[in-house]
């Protein structure tokens, strides 16, 4: 497993634990996060705040990686994954997701796009 795939493991672990306190270490200060339902999130601190808010109200979060594809140079990563969680008394199971990442020279995420 290369560096980019390890970054995904860290991020998916943060989602599962609902603890995004280490996001500033994982993303660059000017990172761009794009997802379908909101305007772009720019910067590691705004990404952290968004993910913290997004995880609020979700319990028993589970992330399953179905396919992880890392570029040979470790600068890009594609992940097909599912997410399950409980919210408002209802269980949501195996919601399909796809994420694409770009990495800066220092190994941190500088680009993240999610599809649902």
Regions found by a protein language model. Give the residues of each.
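Short, aromatic-enriched amphipathic alpha-helices that serve as compact interaction elements
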Residues: 1-18, 26
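A solvent-exposed, acidic/Ser-Thr-rich amphipathic alpha-helical stretch
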Residues: 5, 20-75
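Short, cysteine-centered beta-strand-loop-beta hairpins and adjacent loop/turn segments enriched
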Residues: 57-60, 84-93
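Short, surface-exposed coil-to-beta transition loops
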Residues: 62-64, 78-80, 93-99
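Short beta-strand edge/turn micro-motifs at domain boundaries
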Residues: 96-116
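Short Pro/Gly-enriched beta-strand edge/turn motifs at strand-loop
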Residues: 48-50, 79-84
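Short hydrophobic/aromatic-rich beta-strand segments that constitute the beta-sheet cores
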Residues: 33, 79, 111-112
